[in-house]
Regions:
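N-terminal Rossmann NAD(P)H-binding glycine-rich loop of SDR-like oxidoreductase domains
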Residues: 1-27
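Short, well-ordered alpha-helices that flank and scaffold nucleotide-derived cofactor binding pockets
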Residues: 15, 19, 42, 105-108
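SDR active-site strand-loop-helix element
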Residues: 3, 27, 74-78, 116-120
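A short helix-coil junction within the Rossmann-fold of NAD(P)-dependent oxidoreductases
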Residues: 84-85, 106-113
Length: 120
């Protein structure tokens, strides 16, 4: 699974994994938003590979648990993106910490995840 798959880093990771014929669960904030999914759906998939786009809210622990369920590896690139804020702690730092904690808690609650890669 790649969190933040619609972002710059996440989408490049997804493209690389698909080019190697891997199955990828790609999480996005809004699966109905063409800006978030069209570029992912247009990626080349090598033989044996598969792309599954899943909507996930980092701040909703149940959403994160559903997305992690059944995955062997998690590459966590998702983050709350706010370009400018006078309340950076509240709008950027706290949500990023909670989101990462939700990912880690979801991984801890399952026996299937064997590998975690976290970017920051």
């Amino acid at each position: 699974m790649v969190t933040g798959a619609s972002g710059y880093i996440g989408s490049h990771i997804v493209a690389n994994l698909l080019s190697k014929g891997m199955s990828v669960r790609a999480t996005v904030r809004d699966s109905s938003d063409p800006e978030r999914v069209d570029h992912l759906e247009s990626l080349s998939v090598s033989d044996g590979g598969h792309l599954e786009i899943v909507e996930m809210d980092l701040l909703d622990s149940e959403s994160v648990h559903r997305a992690v369920s059944g995955c062997e590896s998690v590459i966590h690139t998702a983050a709350v993106v706010v370009l400018k804020s006078k309340r950076a702690q509240e709008k950027i730092v706290d949500p990023s910490v909670v989101g990462t904690r939700n990912v880690l808690d979801a991984i801890d609650s399952t026996d299937c995840v064997k590998c975690l890669v976290h970017t920051s």
